[in-house]
């Protein structure tokens, strides 16, 4: 179970590793959760701290379920690495790498959107987010979120397209993802290897970040100095806290941690 992080001290052995990297989710970790997903943004103070870490030589990589375009726009940080679409797309040193096997999934997502259009019309607040080969169905703004969730799952079960995807739930969203063995865990390990990291701190707030925490924990058994940190909200699941070494309270806690890291690095 995650211990509440109140000091930078437990992380110092990890921070002393070279190269050292910060692997972080974006929504709910760096950027506050907002009612409309398109309005999300990393606060400028947080961006400034991340830029400061990059200047200190920290290899920052952001791992998100968003599309690459959306992730880069929300973060506003051109000089860091990205793993978008839960790792389906990597962006490192200005080069984009797309996971093989995604052919046809964008068309399937459009079909799923069409199947869900009646639901969007009938339940105010349901919103579809087309991420290319992935589809997110948001229901945070609905009047009765649990009722909306059940209706979305029922519609997805009726849609013949759904069987071509993994269905995964997150914070007031349900997502369709290509079943090709890529997640935030595989993305984290790819980034550790590509960036040559000897030490890493991983941050996340949602169920999809459990894959990242688990992968980092396994890598630690093979010599990576690492710490995993759950960013806690009222929506955090017990499984997230069980998977992490430490916990912080919301995006303000993350901002505090980034400042402490910057000071510790001198």
List PLM regions with ranges:
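Non-catalytic pre-domain segments flanking phosphatase-related domains
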Residues: 1-26, 30-34, 38, 45, ...
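The start of beta-strands in P-loop NTPase/AAA+ ATPase cores
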Residues: 20-22, 80, 200
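Glycine-rich phosphate-binding "P-loop"
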Residues: 31-40, 171-179
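Active-site phosphate-binding/coordination module
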Residues: 41-131
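Anion (oxyanion) recognition and catalysis
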Residues: 54-55, 161, 222, 241
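Conserved acidic, metal-coordinating active-site core of Asp-based
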Residues: 115, 123, 129-215, 224
